[in-house]
Amino acid sequence: METTRELSVVPQQGMMTKMGIINPTFIEDAVIVSEKKQEKEHPNFIESNTSGITLEELETNCIVPSFGDNQLTISHQTFIHRIEEAASIFFAGETFGNTEIRVSHKILGRHPSALTKRKEELKPEDETIYYQRMAFCFHIRTICREMNGEEVHLCIGGVRSLNEENLYGKKSPEKFKIFIGWRVRVCSNLMLTCDGLTGRLEVMGDTDIYIAALKLFREFNPEQNLRLLENLGRTMISQEQFCQIIGRLRLYQVLPASQMKELPKVILGDSNINAATKGYIDNPNFGLRGRAKISCWDLMQLLNEAAKQSY
């Protein structure tokens, strides 16, 4: 979200009158105007194919879909509220930034009174709407650290996609993802990269979301996590080592399934690996840039940038 521009006005007496420009009878004197720099609230979203929305718009303009047995799903806004409540309890006394929300895959319907109308005759009040996918996050402004020369704030949020639910059947556990970390990249189709902790939930009610969020926050050690990330910035990779990593990523894709199970899961395909290789050469932020080596931090960012191209 964009912060609003604020102007502070401070009167200073005597400035203009001492110069003999204005009669002191008519004016006290000048003002100094300063303007606060505008900054982007959240760089955390992969924004392609999504649009911003407010919590109020979710609550007033959108319906809540139900399962086949007419039991309601957990609404997007309820999901957001439960994570915010858990954060406000666990991080009591801290200052929170605005919650930014992005949605995609709009699902339209009609009120019964508009069933016989043609599409071009429909008015906004004739339609129902909900969004299949939603992601949100917010920063804790008072928990900030410097990482690799850049100030970062602790970030909390979640993402869910209703296309993972069988809305035609009876109510069943609903799927959500929540996260906490210093650097997060998230999009509405559940693609999530996070340097902290993430949790995949399958819950029957919103109370379970609240409990799971508190558990995730307790397990997260921000200082230890930050030290690990800083170590990434200090650990350098030669060109030979980078080529070995790329080669192993390609080899992973043709391993037998039994061997894959013994290794950490890799979600990068050929196109992502090619993008990371290209970024190694010409990415202005994380590539070689005339250097002989890059850091592990640069490598992580190159892979994150490559993963974004699939979404």
Regions found by a protein language model. Give the residues of each.
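Intrinsically disordered, low-complexity regions enriched in serine/threonine
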Residues: 1-43, 119-311
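Compositionally biased, flexible interaction segments
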Residues: 56-173
